[in-house]
Amino acid sequence: MGVHPDGADAWALQDVLARGVTAGAPPDEYNQLGQDWSQPPWRPDQLEAGEYLPFRALIGAVLRHAGGVRIDHIIGLFRLWWIPEGAPPTAGTYVRYNHEAMIGIVALEAHRAGAVVVGEDLGTVEPWVRDYLRERGLLGTSILWFERDEYTRAPRPAERWREYCLSSVATHDLPPTAGYLAGDHVRLRDSLGLLTRPVADEMADDDREKGAWLAELRRLGLLAEGEQGSEQVITALYRFLARTPSRLVALALTDAVGDRRTQNQPGTTDEYPNWRVPLADPDGRLLLLEDVFTDARAAALCEVLRAELTG
């Protein structure tokens, strides 16, 4: 996504990184105050003057030992929200990039490496961008909670999901599904002062949207009447994912083991311990990566996915 403003990359690439501004995102439904990522953005003029060599080197290095890579906020290769240093995200503006050159480099380097590229095309996206990425052979990202009909806001039927994408129930910018079902994402943002509406209104809207998904799961026979425990609902949600035409389906580690704590809260720096929340089971027992492979809950959810995907 970017580099630390005081890191080695920022020093070595200071000729092609903009100073006095940071990259971020404008306000949207889930981040009502916008986001400031505290990262210096690429300068499009200097990239072009240098034939995009620093960007090519970066993509080449990422793909050198990878069979696949996910590019966070890939829409930033089309236009990126620049925020004056010290100003709130709402004071930012979009700066355009030569997406033909930058996406072309990503596609070329991926082809050379024989790797798949997944772009996170979420947030404020221009309508044509997803089609453009697809035409260049890049997969998009579909998150269950965001997949709603454009007009009715009802859950998007499984058969109408995109084929060329990576689908998941959760994302790193949301709580694990157990926490999302409990409304943790609303309460956390309220406690951090990130909401622009009364918390009761946010909770009411959130409950309606989750209720619509539960009704859809029951309509499809994936969730029985009366079943509402988080483990049962999570299993049903992943079974739904497996019925979409998506080329790739992702199972979050946190969902696999039943953790509900938020790993990352957009729009925060020191206010929340982002990326410092160790993986744990529902009882709070810390888990190492090796523990996941012997975790009964994770094994059961993986088996459900395997059975649905293989028919």
Functional labels for PLM-detected ranges:
Residues 258-311:
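Structured C-terminal cap/extension of enzyme domains
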Residues 2-250, 254-255, 270-271, 276-285:
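Alpha-amylase-like alpha-glycosidases and glucanotransferases acting on alpha-linked glucans and related
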